[in-house]
Amino acid sequence: MMPLSRSRLEFIATILQNVLNLGLLTLGLILIVFLGKETVHLADALFVPEQASKYELVEGLVIYFLYFEFIALIVKYFKSGLHFPLRYFVYIGITAIVRLIIVDHKTPMDVLLYSAAILLLVITLWLCNSNRLRRE
């Protein structure tokens, strides 16, 4: 089998990068639609006087921030020269675990394990932002 030339490999990489960019752009637009739907849902939950709606409101707020963080991640990808910064994934992970604690807090051991996971992610975030792991 004949190896591909450098120009062909670059052409393939360019095609795949464009497909990735188009997919992320589509995902961003879908997330904006979901963000709008979540805004309407939050407005509905805000004006319902029942106690159960307060939990729904808090859960909706955290979901809202997850959508917002994913959209911010996609924006950052395009602004930073087609690169995903690691710390944005860590922020999303922390927010997702906080949502899980709010929604599913059945046993104290689960909450403790989720809290330990958040602590691990915060330590990861600290290491990523420290000078030890900074890129040149």
UniProtKB/Swiss-Prot annotation:
Instruction: Give the principal location in a single coarse category.
Output: membrane
Pfam hit, one: PsiE
Question: What is the topology of this protein in the membrane according to its UniProt annotation?
Answer: Multi-pass membrane protein
For the Periplasmic compartment, the record's topological domain ranges are 36-54, 104-107
Which superkingdom, per the lineage? Bacteria
Q: Which residues lie on this side of the membrane: Cytoplasmic?
A: 1-14, 76-82, 129-136
Looking at the UniProt entry, the stretches that span the membrane are: 15-35, 55-75, 83-103, 108-128
Q: Which InterPro entries match?
A: P_starv_induced_PsiE, P_starv_induced_PsiE-like
**Family statement drawn from the similarity comment of this UniProt entry:** Belongs to the PsiE family.
Q: Provide the protein name.
A: Protein PsiE
**Protein's organism:** Salmonella paratyphi A (strain ATCC 9150 / SARB42)
